[in-house]
């Protein structure tokens, strides 16, 4: 897990890991790293932020992260939430919010008689028009690395997020003899549901260090002198009531 304070560049680190793994797979004989990647956001708001960064492979070229002499090796196909594109053999980057994988799960199938039990699930009725779900496309990949954004939402055996990723891992084990290539968690607070930090943290970049390194701004502590707390605060007047506090914070 990567424990990084908010605003210190988790997205940049994700992009660096992806470039390193992808090019290693392409250039190093016998590499066991990934050339397929799944970035998972906890909700649509976080997904939209990731979408802005990764759309059209923007983040990889803006920083820049891809060495010019290796640009010809880069062939990553980007598949965003809602895309129906089929994965490419040259490598893929899926960026989704976890709810989309929930919604696209294959329906459970149970044999209704002995013949069904022997023959298994019947094929799709119209293969020509059939569109594989996001989950089906992800399960079809090999050499898959998962990167969880805001990963404090993930690790609880009862959480659907955790169960979904474990199901993908187990599916890969059954099909290819090995599961996920890597599972990386990114969060400012990578804690379990009981409040303890993940024992697999390998990077710890706290807010105090980020402030000292001038990566983020130092917090401003405002001391009130002779100022009473606002009263009768409602939704319609909250901006007006707290106007002085807002102005001070912005300045």
Where are the regions that the model predicts?
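RecA-like P-loop NTPase motor core of helicase/translocase proteins
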Residues: 1-251
